[in-house]
Regions:
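C-terminal beta-signal and adjacent terminal beta-strands/loops
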Residues: 549-550, 554-556, 832, 904-917, ...
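Transmembrane beta-barrel wall of Gram-negative outer-membrane proteins
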Residues: 301-410, 444, 512-518, 523-539, ...
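Membrane-embedded beta-barrel scaffold of Gram-negative outer-membrane proteins
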Residues: 149-150, 309, 447-477, 708-714, ...
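N-terminal periplasmic accessory domains that precede
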Residues: 124-125, 184-187, 204-207, 220, ...
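Solvent-exposed loop segments that connect transmembrane elements
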Residues: 335-376, 411-434, 475-508, 548-613, ...
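Structural signature of Gram-negative outer-membrane beta-barrels, strongest in the C-terminal barrel
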Residues: 390-394, 523-525, 531, 535-539, ...
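Gram-negative outer-membrane beta-barrel transporters
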Residues: 532, 638, 780, 784-790, ...
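Short acidic/polar hinge/loop motifs at secondary-structure boundaries
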Residues: 220-225, 229-260, 310, 353
């Protein structure tokens, strides 16, 4: 034993010491460290408090002890000294944010047989214990067979997933790589209780727990559709749009979190049913990293695909400044064939049948698509980059700046035609389009996040600015099968001498979205018995959309349409149809010069029969707070939170048409097409503010370290909005009667009037859940039972008669469900993961729809399209069962870390929409039943050192899963899963200091 000649003298000295002298303190500690056996060195509580550095700002997961000590040092500024052989084979326990350094280090070392001692206030030695003091039995150190802990930020602070009392599904970056998932369509199938309805990449609505009613067409949805009830976040920035999900390419992501149930307290409007959060990897201050992934794949019945992404992490100033960047490109080959076809008018066309007694006028023009017919005509390409810079001012303050860019370009369509517009069956994976179609979707996002501390409180500022531009062109030739096409495409001096010109038609949508958000939040340390988080939030959305429908035959002397220059008013009030036609005015109407707000003030080209030019504004101001109180410390916790928000929505612009052109056309003055209908939305003064509280309460019981029970009551909401045209009384509404006796009732009551505005809907959730670990943390089983009540549901309806999309407030729905998920480390190499959800939804209260005279509509007695369906009807996108299972076996073969995995996914049948009795061109209901399906994926691979190679197969049975069906392009289009795909993926990773 080493002797210490000064020890007795030190013990004889007066206990008085200088409280402010780090030098004296360091000398004392050095003496103790040299002379005292490590096992006898216990720092007094007062000294430990004096030496306690900054509390942890983030959780540190269980991992090899050297890496855990390194992570602790980065957060606290402590330096650790140890002999590598002492710690190299040890694993740490996980520690939570908010703990002080001493408590965190003590927790890390539990069960390892190691102790620590202070050399100086900021230098600590780790060494083997010589004497084990009397204490509770040490816990078993984590082993390689234990399941890895997952850290999430669902409560706006870093926590172990198993300690968060809510249903959360997490796909880590490692999991995404194992699943070879890079886009939303790749990973959504592995999320029980999550579905999506859409017509192609970046053209979907996301639904959680079956809270869906269906969607209208993507054209004009930006300004006429309700906002999604599931929020999409890129780090701290929300980025959802109606019918157009932000399909962020999953390169260099830390994880994707799916928070289920209302998240209105911490995430606000739009998070009514849940949140999908893309969390990016952040720059590392102490390591240089480089990663490259390359892949090639071939799709059955389709073209080849390829992808390449590269990531670089580079410290610029040691422990202070680092940058991280990722760049990616992926081209996915098409698999839909545009078949050669000829389009000729038919006696069954609604317009031909109505006006010409099923006789096609002589000399009517036919067209073909021979010049654009092609196989595999729907490729999609993702190109993008993300650059991040992290600057740490000191141990308390840091700033993160992120710049993201992505460009997605898709050709063709992603929905096969089950039958063409005449109802004739079509081959698998085929369509018949007569004009080029494409979708271009680009976004840029700049975000700044500042983290800091003031005393014990943690402060976070998060600000971001998103710009998203969409340009889409789609073939619309099948519109000629409808009832109104003859008004625009057929003309003659008399009905007997009418000629129908080309049926070729397209629509062109240009949408620009800007979103600015700012949030300031403050939180207490996570280990306080009473802890809280609160904040202020502001966001400003603006959606500018122009949609032009080109289906008008431009005959001599036709006058092109343009934005309205004013509106008609009666006694100073804007007339309902406030256009530029005298026919839409009433006696005493006066024209008021007042140009509508225009994104494009120009006269439209000839052939443009109808256009929208609308700007939609959406502003939210909110304040929120949530408090946790440990009724029984570390055992029973009560949480209560609320959010007050004021949401303003507005709309300006115009909807302009040329429907006053007549079948009988005389080029001599007066030309009927000099007139137009023009709705000046500025005159409607479309501006509403919705405000109120939405709250959340939770009681969680930590039965033991591995068993959490909780009950949650929570509320969510979604703001209201406007329909682009308040329909006048008559048959032009999407709810228009389609036959007797509905037509007679419509005539009796003055027709149906589409509401000018739709109100917010709301969701209330009651949930009982559990999170458990078993078998020495080799088995995880989580689950929840819930009831959700969705009231005044916003329903998107598509008017087949005149192709008009509107949003209505429908009835009340109730959803009962059960979810469960499990992970089992069966052996050291075999891991099985599974998830399942059972859902039952029904309409419990019918919505109220009124005739123009205010009389309620009785859908049960009339042949009318009911947006909600009859009582007891299920929601759309709500399969009664969803489930998946994934098995992965890892083993070492010839020095390589090899693996094999297989995945299976099953989804039961569901409906595409709640809409009922609206006819389609093939007859029957548009509430299409989507059959259930099962798909299988598999992968084999091996890695050595920095290299990894894998071969994978997706949809191995080449199942044609029907994901969504719609009729918005005037034929039944069915979005199907990508056919069987076999691919090769090669990865390389470098890491150094």
């Amino acid at each position: 034993m080493q002797k210490c000649p000064n020890r007795k003298r030190m013990g004889d000295q007066s206990p008085r010491r200088s409280t402010g002298s780090a030098t004296v303190m360091s000398a004392v500690l050095r003496a103790l460290s040299i002379c005292a056996p490590a096992a006898l060195l216990d720092i007094p509580p007062t000294l430990a408090q004096a030496l306690e550095p900054t509390a942890l700002a983030a959780d540190i997961p269980a991992q090899p002890l050297p890496q855990a000590l390194e992570a602790l040092g980065r957060q606290t500024g402590l330096q650790f000294v140890y002999v590598s052989g002492v710690v190299q084979d040890q694993r740490s326990h996980a520690v939570s944010a908010g703990l002080g350094a001493n408590k965190a280090l003590t927790r890390m070392l539990e069960g390892t047989g190691l102790k620590f001692e202070y050399l100086t206030p900021h230098n600590i030695r780790i060494l083997a214990a010589v004497v084990v003091p009397l204490q509770e039995p040490t816990k078993k150190a984590p082993s390689d067979e234990e399941l890895q802990e997952v850290i999430v930020t669902a409560n706006r602070r870093e926590q172990n997933l198993q300690n968060v009392p809510m249903t959360i599904q997490v796909l880590t970056g490692e999991t995404l790589a194992k699943l070879n998932a890079t886009t939303f369509d790749d990973f959504v199938k592995y999320l029980p209780a999550v579905t999506a309805h859409g017509v192609g990449p970046s053209q979907s609505n996301i639904y959680v727990r079956g809270l869906a009613t269906g969607a209208s067409g993507v054209q004009s949805s930006g300004v006429t559709g309700g906002f999604p009830n599931v929020a999409v976040y890129l780090d701290e920035q929300s980025a959802q749009l109606p019918n157009r999900n932000l399909d962020i390419y999953a390169a260099d992501l830390d994880r994707i979190e799916i928070l289920e149930g209302p998240q209105g307290t911490l995430f606000g409007a739009g998070a009514e049913a849940g949140v999908v959060r893309y969390i990016t990897n952040k720059p590392k201050l102490d390591v240089t990293e480089a990663m490259v992934n390359a892949g090639y794949a071939t799709t059955a019945h389709g073209d080849q695909s390829s992808n390449l992404d590269a990531t670089l992490n580079l410290p610029l100033i040691a422990d202070q400044l680092a940058v991280r960047a990722v760049i990616y490109n992926e081209r996915r080959g098409g698999y839909i064939n545009n078949l050669p076809a000829t389009f000729a008018r038919a006696p069954t066309d609604l317009g031909i049948a109505t006006y010409f007694n099923h006789n096609v006028p002589a000399n009517s023009v036919s067209i073909n698509n021979f010049n654009i017919a092609a196989n595999h005509f729907n490729p999609v390409t993702y190109t993008g980059l993300r650059a991040e810079a992290l600057y740490r001012l000191d141990q308390d303050w840091s700033a993160l700046l992120v710049q993201s860019y992505q460009n997605m370009e898709a050709d063709g369509v992603f929905a096969e035609m089950a039958a063409n517009s005449l109802g004739e069956p079509q081959p698998d994976l085929s369509a018949q389009l007569f004009n080029p179609s494409y979708d271009k979707d680009k976004f840029e996002n700049t975000a700044l996040t500042i983290n800091g501390r003031v005393g014990a409180l943690k402060l976070v500022y998060a600000g971001a600015y998103l710009v998203r531009n969409v340009e889409q062109v789609q073939d619309y030739t099948n519109y000629a099968r409808g009832g109104y096409a003859v008004y625009y495409q057929c003309a003659g001096p008399t009905l007997a001498r009418v000629q129908c010109f080309t049926p070729s038609a397209t629509w062109h949508d240009r949408e620009r979205n800007t979103h600015q958000s700012h949030e300031l939040r403050v939180s207490t340390p996570a280990d306080w018995r009473v802890r809280g988080i609160g904040g202020l939030f502001y966001e400003n959305y603006q959606i500018q959309e122009q949609v032009d429908w080109f289906y008008l035959t431009a005959l001599p002397d036709f006058n092109p349409i343009g934005p309205p220059t004013g509106y008609y008013a009666v006694n100073g009030s804007p007339f309902q149809q406030n256009g530029t036609l005298a026919m839409f005015s009433t006696p005493g109407a006066v024209f008021v010069p007042a140009p509508a707000t225009s994104n494009n003030p120009n006269i439209r080209p000839l052939g443009d029969a109808f256009f929208d030019d609308i700007t939609r504004g959406y502003k939210q101001k909110a304040a929120y707070a949530s408090v946790d109180f440990e009724v029984v410390p570390q055992t029973l916790t009560l949480t209560a939170g609320t959010r007050y928000s004021s949401t303003n929505t507005s709309e300006v612009g115009s909807a302009v048409g040329s429907e006053t052109c007549e079948l009988t056309y005389n080029p001599a003055p007066p030309n009927p097409c000099l007139n137009r209908s023009a709705i000046n939305l500025n005159a409607e003064e479309l501006d509403r503010t919705f405000s109120g509280f939405k709250s959340r309460a939770n009681l969680s019981w930590k039965v033991n370290e591995d068993f959490l029970l909780y009950y949650t009551w929570s509320q969510g909401f979604r703001a209201g909005g406007f329909n682009r045209t308040p329909f006048p009384a008559g048959s032009n509404s999407p709810l228009a009667p389609n036959g007797e006796p509905g037509q007679a009732q419509a005539d009796k009551h003055g027709g149906y009037v589409t509401p000018l505005a739709f109100a917010p809907d709301s969701l209330t959730n009651n949930e009982l859940g559990w999170k458990t670990m078993w078998m020495d943390r080799r088995l995880q089983w989580n689950g929840a039972i819930y009831q959700e009540d969705w009231n005044r549901t916003q329903i998107g309806a598509y008017g087949f008669v005149i192709a008009e999309g509107v949003t209505l407030n429908g009835g009340n729905y109730r959803v009962h469900g059960v979810e469960t998920s499990g992970v089992a480390r069966v052996t050291s190499g075999l891991t099985i993961e599974t998830g399942a959800a059972w859902n039952h939804s029904e309409l419990v209260k019918q919505g109220t729809y009124l005739w123009a005279d205010g009389t309620p509509i009785n859908f049960g007695a009339l042949k009318l399209p009911n947006p909600s369906g009859p009582l007891g009807s299920p929601l759309a996108g709500a399969p009664p069962f969803q489930g998946n299972v994934r098995a992965r076996y890892e083993l070492a073969i010839y020095g390589c870390e090899s693996f094999a995995q297989v995945n299976a996914v099953h989804q039961a049948h569901s409906l595409a929409t709640t809409y009922r009795l609206e006819p389609d061109l093939q007859g029957g209901s548009t509430a299409y039943d989507l059959p259930g399906f099962t798909t299988f994926d598999a992968a084999l691979g091996a890695g050595k050192d920095a290299w990894l190679v894998q071969v994978y197969g997706e949809n191995l049975t080449d199942t044609r899963a029907q994901l969504y069906a719609n009729y918005t392009q005037w034929y039944k289009g069915v979005t199907v899963s990508r056919p069987r795909t076999i691919g090769l993926r090669l990865s390389y990773k470098f890491s150094g200091r």
